[in-house]
Swiss-Prot record:
PANTHER family: WD REPEAT PROTEIN (AFU_ORTHOLOGUE AFUA_8G05640), WD REPEAT PROTEIN (AFU_ORTHOLOGUE AFUA_8G05640)-RELATED. The keyword Nucleus does not apply. SUPFAM superfamilies: WD40 repeat-like. InterPro entries: WD40/YVTN_repeat-like_dom_sf, WD40_repeat_CS, WD40_repeat_dom_sf, WD40_rpt. The lineage of its organism: Eukaryota, Fungi, Dikarya, Ascomycota, Taphrinomycotina. This is Uncharacterized WD repeat-containing protein C2A9.03. Keywords: Cytoplasm, Repeat, WD repeat.
Length: 426
C-alpha cells in the first residue's frame, strides 16, 4: 500500500476537527479502498451518519462492527484498519515548545495485552451529547456511584444512567453563562458538583435537587477544578493563578501564581501538597501553605494533566509531548516510567480508586490502561472521535469514556471481568 498521498486540493483537518471532516478527506486518499459512489452525502457534500450505521436489511454487512457500531468492511466505507492508518498519519498535533521531536523521546517498552484483558466492552450509548469545549481540556465526564455518568452538554450538565440509557438534565446554565459552549471543566462528589468556564466563571451545584450558584473569578479560562470536600475546591486558571475556594467565604484565596497557564491542579486528599501542571515544560509540586515549589517534574512540552495514586507515593503527569510519566514522590530525581501515547497529546490521567490501573487518555481515539504493578503492560482501547473525558466508577469496576463527535459520539462503558489480572504494588 502507498503512503496515502492526498489529491493536491485537499488539506489536512485542523486539530480537534470532527470525524466528518476527516472522513471527507479520507475518501480522496489512496488509503481509502471503498466505493465513493456508494457514500451518502448531505446537502453540503459531507458524508452522513447513515454510512456508519449497521443496516439490518443490507446484504453488504460482511465486515466487523466495532465499539461504535460502525459496519467496517462494507463496499462503501471499506476497511477499518485503513481509516486507522489514515488517522495515525494525519492527525494534527499542536505544541507550545518546538525544540523537541518524537524521535528524541526515551520511552519504555510496554507489552500490549490482549483486547478486553483488563476491562471488557460493555455498551456504547449514542444518545448522550458529550461536549469538550477545548481540545486540551478533557475534563467533561465524571461518575457518581456505579452507573451515573455526569457530563457536559452544550451549556448544561446532564446525568446518564447507563443501565437504563436514560439521560436527565441536572442544571441549565444558558441564562447564567453568556457565551455558548463555555464549560471547560467539571468535578463531582457524591452530592455536589462544580464546573468552570472558558470565561472565568465557576458554578457549584447540587445534582440531586438541581440548585446551583455561579460566581465570576476572572476574565481568563478556568482550566481545572478539583473538589476536595463538599464545601472546598481548588481551581487552576489560564492566567497562572491557583485558588482555593471555600463556599462559606466571600472570595477565593490565591495560593500560588505561576508564570504560565495552569492546565491541571491536584491536591492529594487534604494535604498541603498540590501537583500543578502548566504550559511550561515542568509540572510542579507546590506546598500551598508556604507558596513554595517543592519539586519540578520535567517534560518536553506543556504539561496538560496529572494524577495522584491513592497511596500518595506515586503520581503521573502527561502532556503535549505525547508522554505520560510516572514518578515516585520518595525519589523525584527522574521519572521511573516514560509511557508513550498511540497518536496524540495526553490530556487526562486518572488512577482507578484502588490504584490497580492508570487510564491514559489522549486528545482523540485512544485510552490506554496500564497495570500499575510495573507499568509494563497495557490494554489499548481503540475507537474514533475527540475525547470529552474518562472516569472510573466509585468501585473501579467500570470505566466510562465520553466521545465528543456529532456523528459518532456518545459514552463508551467498559467493565472489569470477575477474574481480572490487575494488581499493584507501592
Amino acid at each position: 500500500m502507498s503512503n496515502g498521498e492526498f489529491i493536491d486540493q485537499y488539506l489536512l483537518p485542523e486539530s480537534g476537527a470532527i470525524l466528518q471532516d476527516y472522513l471527507d478527506d479520507y475518501f480522496y486518499t489512496s488509503w481509502y479502498t471503498g466505493n465513493r459512489n456508494l457514500i451518502q452525502l448531505d446537502h453540503y457534500g459531507f458524508p452522513t451518519a447513515s454510512n456508519f450505521e449497521l443496516n439490518p436489511k443490507s446484504t453488504d454487512n460482511c465486515g466487523t462492527v466495532d465499539f461504535q457500531g460502525i459496519p467496517w468492511g462494507n463496499k462503501a466505507i471499506g476497511k477499518r484498519k485503513n481509516f486507522r492508518l489514515y488517522r495515525l498519519h494525519t492527525y494534527s498535533l499542536s505544541c507550545n515548545h518546538s525544540d523537541w521531536s518524537p524521535e528524541e523521546l526515551s520511552l519504555d517498552t510496554v507489552q500490549v495485552a490482549a483486547e478486553d484483558s483488563f476491562y471488557e466492552f460493555q455498551r456504547f450509548l449514542k444518545n448522550p451529547n458529550c461536549l469538550r469545549n477545548h481540545h486540551h481540556l478533557c475534563k467533561s465526564v465524571k461518575v457518581v456511584g456505579e452507573h451515573s455518568v455526569i457530563y457536559v452538554s452544550n451549556n448544561s450538565i446532564r446525568m446518564e444512567n447507563t443501565l437504563h440509557d436514560n439521560s436527565v438534565q441536572i442544571i441549565d446554565l444558558k441564562n447564567n453563562i453568556l457565551q455558548k459552549k463555555a464549560i471547560s471543566c467539571l468535578d463531582t462528589t457524591n452530592a455536589v458538583g462544580c464546573l468552570g468556564t472558558l470565561y472565568g466563571q465557576y458554578c457549584i451545584f447540587n445534582f440531586k435537587n438541581g440548585s446551583f450558584s455561579t460566581r465570576k473569578l476572572s476574565d481568563d479560562s478556568i482550566n481545572h477544578i478539583q473538589l476536595f470536600s463538599e464545601k472546598k475546591f481548588i481551581l487552576g486558571c489560564n492566567d497562572g493563578a491557583v485558588y482555593v475556594e471555600d463556599v462559606q467565604r466571600t472570595s477565593p484565596i490565591l495560593v500560588y501564581r505561576c508564570s504560565n497557564a495552569v492546565n491541571c491542579v491536584q491536591l492529594f486528599d487534604e494535604t498541603p501538597l498540590a501537583l500543578v501542571c502548566t504550559d511550561s515544560k515542568d509540572a510542579m509540586l507546590i506546598d500551598i501553605r508556604s507558596n513554595s515549589v517543592s519539586a519540578k517534574l520535567p517534560h518536553s512540552d506543556s504539561v496538560l494533566t496529572g494524577s495522584w495514586h491513592p497511596n500518595g507515593n506515586i503520581l503521573a503527569t502527561g502532556g503535549q509531548d505525547t508522554t505520560a510519566k510516572v514518578w515516585d514522590i520518595r525519589a523525584l530525581g527522574k521519572s521511573f516510567r516514560n509511557l508513550g501515547s498511540q497518536m496524540s497529546a495526553v490530556t487526562n490521567l486518572c488512577f482507578s480508586p484502588l490504584g490497580e490501573s492508570l487510564a491514559v487518555t489522549e486528545q482523540a481515539d485512544f485510552v490506554q490502561l496500564f497495570d500499575t504493578k510495573l507499568f509494563n503492560t497495557s490494554q489499548v482501547i481503540d475507537f474514533f472521535g475527540e475525547i470529552a473525558g474518562t472516569a472510573y466508577s466509585s468501585s473501579g469496576d467500570s470505566l466510562f469514556i465520553g466521545v465528543d463527535d456529532p456523528m459518532l459520539g456518545g459514552i463508551l462503558e467498559f467493565r472489569r471481568p470477575l477474574q481480572h489480572p490487575l494488581s499493584f504494588i507501592f
